[in-house]
Regions:
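Beta-strand-turn-beta hairpins that frame and shape the catalytic cleft
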Residues: 8-10, 143-148, 186-191
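Glycine-rich beta-alpha junction loops
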Residues: 16-18, 155-157, 197-199
Length: 244
């Protein structure tokens, strides 16, 4: 497998792993680390929790899901660092936000008890808490990534605004809500999604998008041999065949 001649560092920032990492989303970080290493890069991982100092420069940003209580814990801090995250998003830094952080990257999340958590507005989406839980295996189709699979488990229902582009279209499952057939949202290189499982182990094309985008932004190019994703493909096949 070809790789950069000299080790090149890629900095990966994980947002709020202490409070927003209860559905196995840490697996996304593990996939990015391993694939960076396979491609010959040196991953530098920074864990950011409430009250920490945000680094000046990053190459990839990821964040996971949590309970409503977890969102409330991080909310004020997220609003504080929101302008910096906005700037990074506008610059084209690749990001992956899952479930709870996907919701807070939108305009707001209105909980079932009518508490409104203001979002940072990177994604043109709005989320409303409901009594209906959307749970089960999900299969979607993306123009950019092909078939994307995962597991959804959320009671918040998210609706896209006019400026939002869906991450994928639902083939089996619910997606953002129980009405329109959209899953997730994209702004530039920022992806928001409800797919757990974790999403990246079974969808290496999405992981490689984050890595390739980061490498090209930082070093101007991305050249490598293909990784043998045989086991990921096997997992995908099994997951696709599972009932809802």
């Amino acid at each position: 497998m070809s790789s950069p001649k000299t080790p090149q560092e890629i900095t990966v920032l994980q947002l709020y792993p202490r409070d927003m990492n209860i559905y196995g989303d840490h697996g996304n970080l593990q996939v990015i680390i391993r694939r960076l290493e396979w491609y010959g890069y040196t991953p530098k991982v920074i864990h950011y929790n409430v009250g920490d100092t945000l680094p000046k420069n990053v190459d990839i940003v990821i964040g996971g899901g949590g309970q409503d209580s977890g969102q409330e814990k991080i909310h004020a801090d997220l609003l504080k660092i929101g302008p910096k995250l906005h700037g990074w998003a506008d610059e084209g830094i690749p990001m992956l936000m899952v479930c709870g952080l996907y919701q807070l990257f939108g305009h707001f999340f209105k909980t079932l008890n009518n508490t409104v958590l203001e979002g940072i507005g990177i994604l043109d989406v709005e989320t409303f808490g409901t009594n209906e839980r959307l749970i089960g295996n999900i299969v979607t189709q993306s123009d950019k990534f092909g078939e994307i699979i995962g597991y959804e488990n959320h009671s918040g229902q998210t609706f896209l605004g006019e400026k939002a582009t869906p991450f994928a279209t639902v083939i089996k499952g619910a997606g953002n809500n129980s009405k329109d057939g959209h899953e997730g949202a994209i702004y530039k290189n920022v992806i928001g999604t409800y797919l757990h499982g974790s999403i990246l182990p079974k969808n290496p094309a999405v992981a490689d998008f984050l890595i390739k985008t980061a490498a090209k932004r930082k070093y101007g190019s991305f050249s490598h041999d293909l990784i043998d994703d045989m086991f990921a493909d096997m997992a995908r096949h099994i997951a696709i065949e599972r009932p809802r």
